[in-house]
Amino acid sequence: MKISNEVENKLLVYKNMLLEANKKTNLIGVRTIKNVWERHICDCAQALNYFPKNKKYTSFVDIGSGAGLPGIVVKILREEITAHLVESNYKKYSFIARANSQLFLGMKIYQERFENIKPSQIGKNVILARALLPLKKLLNLTFDHFKVGSIGIFHKGVNWEKEIKEAQTLWKFDFDAHESLTNNKSRIIVVNSVEKK
């Protein structure tokens, strides 16, 4: 992905903010600190490869955003998209708010649990989630949003196949599993047309 100098500078500022804040608040795992660019920035950026090409989706919601991963990275790369970031933990929410202000991102941030965010508040979205919940629970959490036409782009680790099989015991859904560009054992799962069995 080619990016402008301005975008690259924003990503670098964000990366440095993340590393500095991580000294006081557990935002990212200690083992990933030395490889933040690939492990977090690039990993999050690849979600954009799977955003719908049509103009029906002009916003995304990052649920359980944590350090703003992937939401902040996606917003920096695609500033024209409306961004909703949901994080209930105050310290993590505060970090996201600080990054939003310092980088002039104009994101809408909610210090709230996602189950309290109604589709009527944020509309139809691309739903992003990274390292949040098993797929079965994730679909339960987001089901009301799928009912209004949202789609999901979920980062999943090495147990992705098991998660899909478990989710299929309770849910009917269409999905595509794309090999992660940063870890060939992980997948980016694109989910839509979710129904209860």
Residue ranges and their predicted role:
Residues 67-80:
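Conserved SAM-binding loop of SAM-dependent methyltransferases across substrates and taxa
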Residues 61, 84, 153:
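Conserved beta-strand positions in the Rossmann-like core of class I SAM-dependent methyltransferases
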Residues 109, 159-197:
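Active-site capping/gating segments
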Residues 58, 81, 105-107, 150, ...:
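A structural micro-motif
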Residues 1-57, 61, 91-105:
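Class I SAM-dependent transferase core
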Residues 77-145, 158:
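Conserved nucleotide-cofactor-binding alpha/beta core module
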Residues 149-160:
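Conserved beta-strand signature within the Rossmann-like core of class I S-adenosyl-L-methionine
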Residues 62-66:
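Conserved S-adenosyl-L-methionine
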